Amino acid sequence: MLTFNLNAISSSFSVVPFHANYPLSTQTQLLVPSNLSYSFATTGTRKFKSFQLKAGFWESIKSGLMKNNSMQVIDPPSADEEDEEPLPQEFVLVEKTEPDGTIEQIIFSSGGDVDVYDLQALCDKGWPRRPLSKLAAALKNSYIVASLHSIRKSPGSEGNEQKRLIGMARATSDHAFNATIWDVLVDPGYQGQGLGKALIEKLIRTLLQRDIGNITLFADSQVVEFYRNLGFEADPEGIKGMFWYPNH
């Protein structure tokens, strides 16, 4: 179990997505934040948690995404640090122009509008298939569902956009103190571009803005060190993640 360490937030903060998905293997660890204090009610604490993330968010995205001059990272509306407003539920994260004039936008959304059939199609590209009814229930019962959609616009094809789900992550929560991140998926064709980092960082930022400070996730053993380097800690203060499995 890995926990996100609030004290480790810096201007260079970024998070590498984990690749553990149901069913959990015996080599999976639950990762959680080391700051386990529940005193998150004061305005000063909220500002500390959200504003420390602000500086490094777009810089980390740009460093991973801007590989040529035809790609543009579009910043969301800025806000004064003393009175930061929550980011919009949907905005253009990346826009790039291909040699043939086709424009592709990567849209980030935290509104939870993910089609279950689109999600199943994404899972079929490298993750275990799950029953549609359970996928729908998981989405419905999540606290936050964050997604990435690719929208492609070809020259002369106004009104005929191609929209495709290319990434998703979700969080469950008690709506007060704790949240766990699940099902981090990025289309293999879009991996290695920093989109997974952007997706998870935005999800964490949204949780912190909602005054939820204990953020955990599951990670395969081979990526635990990546999370330690990014502010997550395994077994903070000796606290263990425990699992119950049926005996049959």
From Swiss-Prot:
Paired cysteines (S-S): none
E.C. numbers: 2.3.1.-
PROSITE patterns, per database record: GNAT
Annotated GO CC locations: cytoplasm; nucleus
All copies of domain N-acetyltransferase, residue ranges: 106-248
InterPro entries: Acyl_CoA_acyltransferase, GNAT_dom, NSI-like
Primary localization: cytoplasm
Keyword Nucleus listed: yes
Gene Ontology MF, one: N-acetyltransferase activity
One family name in Pfam for this protein: Acetyltransf_1
Family annotation (SUPFAM superfamilies): Acyl-CoA N-acyltransferases (Nat)
PANTHER family: ACYL-COA N-ACYLTRANSFERASE, GCN5-RELATED N-ACETYLTRANSFERASE 2, CHLOROPLASTIC
Complexes and interactors: Does not interact with the effector Avh52 from the pathogen Phytophtora sojae.
Protein name per Swiss-Prot or TrEMBL: Probable acetyltransferase TAP2
Gene that this polypeptide is encoded by: TAP2
